[in-house]
């Protein structure tokens, strides 16, 4: 996946390369310390996108989801400091991903910095 924290501020493309937005934070699985979710500013709102399968390609991060799926994702009212519980389950259902590897995920920079990026 490359150096995930350096992805903050990087453009995000969907699985076919269409622009989605910019990474404004990375959420790590608290149990494994692995990146689990990317907080992306789409210019319209902040959305969380699974980090699994994301690849660094040139100066972009490419995620394995269509832009339409990302645009339709449930969005937090404000960036959470920790992603867990029902919000995590709603996102997992939306993207069709398993969440057993991420019982709780903490943001690298936290909600204040991510909110500034919005």
What are these regions (language model features)?
Residues 1-118:
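Peripheral interaction segments used for macromolecular assembly
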């Amino acid at each position: 996946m490359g150096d995930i924290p350096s992805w903050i501020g990087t453009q995000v493309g969907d699985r076919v390369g269409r622009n989605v937005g910019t990474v404004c934070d990375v959420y790590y699985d608290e149990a494994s310390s692995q990146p689990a979710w990317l907080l992306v500013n789409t210019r319209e709102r902040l959305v969380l996108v699974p980090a699994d399968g994301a690849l660094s390609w040139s100066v972009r991060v490419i995620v394995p989801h269509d832009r339409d799926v990302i645009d339709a994702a449930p969005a937090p009212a404000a960036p959470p400091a920790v992603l867990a519980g029902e919000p995590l389950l709603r996102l997992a259902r939306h993207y069709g991903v398993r969440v057993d590897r991420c019982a709780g995920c903490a943001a690298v920079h936290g909600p204040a910095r991510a909110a500034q990026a919005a």
